[in-house]
Structure formats: structure tokens, C-alpha cells
């Protein structure tokens, strides 16, 4: 007999344009499921998800993919860089999906590498970088195409405190420039950098 597991139960909240929101809660409470739905990697079985004015929960798969590639940037705990590509190539990757001319792609990559203080690593491969440098590359890749929304899943989880603080500073600066950020974290100190915190427990919001 199949037993239905409810990962998220009547979760309702609004993130305003330009806000920085942290999501906290114990392992297994639904944080990753929520982030996957926000990132259009999973579909909710019921309910709606409005991204701007569009109910993206009703889109066809191809349209969802286009929205994801054009409007949402992802930052992961494990960086998720492609080992065979250089730093510059990793950062350029999202731009190749947007029919952007090569010259403009290169210029954008140069600008964001300078911003993230990794220009001197442009031709290095991920395994030649420290954890902090890899996360800077991952953030550069996430923002290079100017997404409306950044989803960060434990962005400092694999970093020491110094590199973690630098990554949080970068995210805070991006938010101050107008980027909307939703961040899942176990770290209370990181959560304090957000404007508000949503706490999940057993698939429900217990505090907002």
C-alpha cells in the first residue's frame, strides 16, 4: 500500500521584489522541496506559484525551462561547477542559452569576474580553486545574466567562517543592488543578514 508523504502542507508566503528572505528549519522539514518548487525544478501537486504576474505552476515544461534559464539564478552548497570548463567558461554557460552574441557574453563575463575578484583565475579549472573561490565563481554564474531571483541553498555550508562571511557579504551587496534572494540555511548568523526569516517545521510555516 502506498503511503503519501506530504513534503509541504499549505505553505503560503510572499517575497517582495528586491527582498532577501532566509528559510530555516530542521533537516527533512521541506526546505529543499520548497526551493526546488521556487526554482521550477519541481512542480507543486496543488496550489499556485506566482513569479511576478505569471502563474508558473501552470506552464508547460518547455516554458518553465525558458523562465528558469532567463529569470532564476542558483547557488548551491556544493558549488556545482563543471570540472572540464574553466572559470570563465563556467560563468559564460548561462549566457549561451540566451542567444547572446559572443562579444557581449565575453564582456559580461569579464565584468562579473572583476566584480567577484576572480579575474586572475579566469583560465583555471574548478579543482585548482579554494572553496571560497569556487563559490564566488558559482555566484558569478548565477548573476551574470541578470536574473530576477537568486535561490541559494546553504551557500556557506562548505566554507570556513572567513570565506562564508565573504560570500554572505557578496549576496548582501547583490540584494542591495536590487536582486531578490531566497536562501535556505542552517546558519543563524547567515539568516541575520536577510531582511526576514521563514521557519519551516514538518512542511508547515511555523514562524514568519
What are these regions (language model features)?
Residues 1-197:
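ABC family nucleotide-binding domain
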Residues 197-208:
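H-loop (His-switch) and adjacent beta-strand-loop-beta switch element
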Amino acid at each position: 500500500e502506498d503511503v503519501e508523504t506530504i513534503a509541504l502542507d499549505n505553505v503560503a508566503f510572499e517575497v517582495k521584489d528586491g527582498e532577501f528572505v532566509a528559510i530555516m528549519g530542521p533537516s527533512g522539514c521541506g526546505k529543499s522541496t520548497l526551493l526546488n518548487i521556487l526554482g521550477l525544478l519541481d512542480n507543486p501537486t496543488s496550489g499556485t506559484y506566482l513569479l511576478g504576474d505569471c502563474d508558473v505552476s501552470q506552464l508547460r515544461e518547455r516554458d518553465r525551462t525558458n523562465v528558469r534559464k532567463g529569470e532564476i539564478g542558483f547557488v548551491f552548497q556544493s558549488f556545482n561547477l563543471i570540472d572540464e570548463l574553466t572559470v570563465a567558461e563556467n560563468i559564460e554557460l548561462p549566457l549561451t542559452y540566451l542567444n547572446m552574441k559572443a562579444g557581449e557574453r565575453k564582456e559580461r563575463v569579464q565584468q562579473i569576474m572583476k566584480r567577484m575578484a576572480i579575474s586572475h583565475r579566469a583560465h583555471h579549472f574548478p579543482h585548482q580553486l579554494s572553496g571560497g573561490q569556487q563559490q564566488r565563481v558559482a555566484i558569478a554564474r548565477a548573476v551574470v545574466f541578470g536574473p530576477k531571483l537568486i535561490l541559494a541553498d546553504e551557500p556557506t555550508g562548505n566554507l570556513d567562517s572567513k570565506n562564508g562571511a565573504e560570500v554572505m557579504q557578496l549576496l548582501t551587496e547583490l540584494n542591495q543592488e536590487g536582486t531578490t534572494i531566497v536562501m535556505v540555511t542552517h546558519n543563524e548568523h547567515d539568516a541575520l543578514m536577510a531582511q526576514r526569516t521563514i521557519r519551516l517545521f514538518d512542511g508547515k510555516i511555523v514562524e514568519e
